[in-house]
């Protein structure tokens, strides 16, 4: 899990993981679970930036 986070944190651009984290989101490889909503992407379409509302 930690390795996955490091891999997902290695980009830029909300199209980058750092921007996603600054907006209070997390990068997820699948669709956003439960009460979370997609607010952007981390590495293009496959990786979503999700945040709880």
From Swiss-Prot:
GO terms for biological process: cell chemotaxis; defense response to bacterium. It comes from the Eukaryota. It is found in: Secreted. The keyword Metal-binding does not apply. GO terms for cellular component: extracellular space. Keywords: Antibiotic, Antimicrobial, Defensin, Disulfide bond, Secreted, Signal. Disulfide bonds join 20-49, 27-42, 32-50. This is Beta-defensin C7. Its main location: secreted. Has bactericidal activity. Belongs to the beta-defensin family. One of its GO terms (molecular function) is chemoattractant activity. It comes from Bos taurus (Bovine). The keyword NADP does not apply.
